[in-house]
Amino acid sequence: MKNAKWVALLLVFALCVGMLAGCGGAGDGRRIIRIGHNQNTEHPTHLGLEAFADFINEKLGDKYVVEVYPSELLGSQTEMVQLTQTGAIDIVVASNSIMETFSANYSLFNLPYLFSSAEAYHAAMDDPAVTDPIFLATEDAGFICVTWLDAGTRNFYTVDKPINAPEDLKGLKIRVQQSPTNVAMMDLLGGTATPMGFGDVYTALQSQIIDGAENNELALTSNGHGDVCKFYSYDMHQMIPDLVLCNWSFLESLSAEDRAVFDEGFKLINTVQRAEWTGAVEAAKEQALNQQGVNFLYPDTAPFQQAVMPLHESVLSGNTELQPIYDMIQAYNAQYAGATE
């Protein structure tokens, strides 16, 4: 783990030196576009980004070369977002959860039980009236969100204690993403929130620094968490999107013609990633069950939901601009009230 971090630091240092020296090109006059994310090369996110790279290289290959860096090679998600702010890298995929430190508007999508179903979630996230006030809120910070990616439903998983009710979380140290909303959620559920970067979770589980975590099913297999955690409980507390963030200065530097191609490419990331997602979840669950010995539990979600609902009022009262967006999401929840997950 230490070696991997040193490699990431050295690579980031090299990128920054290259930027300062004006060496952002490929040596043949083309502009290198660097994209960082924290998943492996088989993950739907990486497949979507590779499709984007192929698309841009095909359409604008005489001007740009797209390079995709998986598995936190350019640093943690937070570090990569900061590098995207400065332009050291151009595009990063990051969870909405960590974005609260850049704009409070992002806290809305971190609320537990914000969406009543996957169908309502997808419909709301595809509506610019819902997403634009949030995705464009970081323009002054140096970047905007150009599209969203499906990260499924987040659920609790633990090393050796099944979670069937909120009371089962009492006394357990649970890794959460690094956001105030997630910490507050765990406090309301009775667990002990332990914020940490995704790349540190496996070691923390293995060494029993934490008792469990919360994420979608792919974390069990793609990241090996199912080798350590043997109980996965479908409490379905969050549907938090991953975001494709792009440096604003880079976008502003594009000609209208090139920007149109990039916008089409951003839509392609979303299309490919979401098309791959459902099959990847099904495959991960089968692998976790049959090869890793993970037990899947289906608790009543109502007690979990009841425990965290005060968080909705807290976030909305602290940022009244979010209320109209929240109301639009509730309208989608009502529209898809009969939908299944």
Predicted regions mapped to residue ranges:
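Generic detector of short alpha-helix boundary/capping microenvironments
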Residues: 10-11, 130
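N-terminal secretory/targeting leader peptides
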Residues: 24-119, 138-341
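Short, solvent-exposed secondary-structure boundary motifs
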Residues: 1, 133-138
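C-terminal motif of bacterial Sec signal peptides marking the signal peptidase cleavage site
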Residues: 18-22
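Core hydrophobic alpha-helical transmembrane segments of single-pass membrane proteins
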Residues: 13-17
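Bacterial N-terminal signal peptides that target proteins for export
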Residues: 1-10
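A gly/proline- and charged-residue-enriched helix-loop-helix capping module
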Residues: 118-135
